């Protein structure tokens, strides 16, 4: 940045979020908050917002960005699968169906906090058992909400996305960039 501004502190362990922000030219410092992600009895969209807020509030710094992504299948949260078998079950349930992906972010600047939730509609094509086995065997879905990564091998599972693709990846990049830019925090 060259202006002596502090780095953007990313309150997330997601390598995807870090890579997206670095691709825009932001210097990033990762500070993974020790926030429990299980057990909050909230609807999916509210859960994403609550988790993003908790993560952001748990980290110190002038410029902090936290985010959380929740996969919503008919009002049920599909988190990160515990193991390959649960990943297989998730993909069977998503096969040929529409689901929602909610990504919430919490942006703290020296003057304010901005919180938003963005939602994309994701349509999976019908998947064969062989395709599911192939994807599960890759291991890609084990660390991702819903058990798939739209930006990796999981792109083969999708029929279409309505809304911001990067919401599905884990951060509505254009919106976050616009908010940072408008507040003078530029790459």
Curated annotation (Swiss-Prot):
EC number, UniProt record: 3.6.1.9
Its biological purpose is as follows:
Nucleoside triphosphate pyrophosphatase that hydrolyzes dTTP and UTP. May have a dual role in cell division arrest and in preventing the incorporation of modified nucleotides into cellular nucleic acids.
Organism phylogeny = Bacteria, Thermotogati, Deinococcota, Deinococci, Thermales
Keywords, comma-separated and alphabetical: Cytoplasm, Hydrolase, Nucleotide metabolism
Q: Report whether Calcium shows up as a keyword of the record.
A: no
What start and end residues bound the annotated signal peptide?
A: none
Write down the NCBIfam families for this protein, in alphabetical order: maf
InterPro entries of this UniProt entry? ITPase-like_fam, Maf-like
The UniProt entry's GO biological process terms, in alphabetical order, are:
nucleotide metabolic process
Query: Which Cys-Cys disulphide bridges does the record give?
Result: none
Protein's UniProt name: dTTP/UTP pyrophosphatase
According to its UniProt record, which cofactors does this protein need?
a divalent metal cation
* UniProt xrefs under SUPFAM superfamilies: ITPase-like
**Is Magnesium among this UniProt entry's keywords?**
no
User: Reaction catalysed by this chain?
Assistant: dTTP + H2O = dTMP + diphosphate + H(+); UTP + H2O = UMP + diphosphate + H(+)
EC top class named in words: hydrolase
Give the family, as the similarity comment puts it.
Belongs to the Maf family. YhdE subfamily.
- Primary location group: cytoplasm
What does the entry list under GO cellular component?
cytoplasm
Q: Which HAMAP family match?
A: Maf
